[in-house]
Amino acid sequence: MVMPLVLSLALTPPPLCHATLVDPRTTLQCHVRSYTFRATKPPIVNENGDPVTCQGDVRVSSCWGRCDSSEIGDYKMPFKISNHPVCTYTGRVSRTVRLSQCAGYPDPTVQVFDATGCACQFCNSETQLCEKLNG
């Protein structure tokens, strides 16, 4: 049985291990950045009828930044030519994390992905959610 996983994202500053610091007000690049989010698995009922919960903070590497975009007028519908790349991963690795607050939960693990590289690219709907980004 597949159980849904609820995630809430809490932004954290980039780790201090980077050789150069990025000024978020001026960067026009895409960077790997560390994020922390709260992962919550759905509650279950144990054999005594008591609810058992499972959650914990998870740190992942993700992409963050800004990309140059443009639009120019055109004589054909939709009367514009759009160029809107997004900051997205160029590689990722999967890992399994054990959540910290899961006493009595049968499987306290979740699968997460870490970005290994980031770049400004056009959205790929086969691997990313591209709503309202493709034109």
Curated annotation (Swiss-Prot):
Protein name as it appears in the record: Thyrostimulin beta-5 subunit
Organism: Conus victoriae
Domain of life: Eukaryota
GO cellular component: cytoplasm; extracellular space
Record family assignment: Belongs to the glycoprotein hormones subunit beta family.
Expression by tissue: Expressed by the venom duct.
Disulfide bridge positions per record: 30-87, 54-102, 63-118, 67-120, 123-130
Main location: secreted
Gene3D superfamilies: Cystine-knot cytokines (2.10.90.10)
SUPFAM superfamilies (UniProt xref): Cystine-knot cytokines
One of the record's GO molecular function terms: toxin activity
Cleavable signal peptide: 1-19
A Gene Ontology BP annotation from the UniProt entry: G protein-coupled receptor signaling pathway
Keywords of this entry: Disulfide bond, Hormone, Secreted, Signal, Toxin
Subunit organization: Heterodimer with GPHA2; non-covalently-linked.
One Pfam family recorded for the sequence: Cys_knot
Keyword Phosphoprotein (UniProt): no
Subcellular location: Secreted
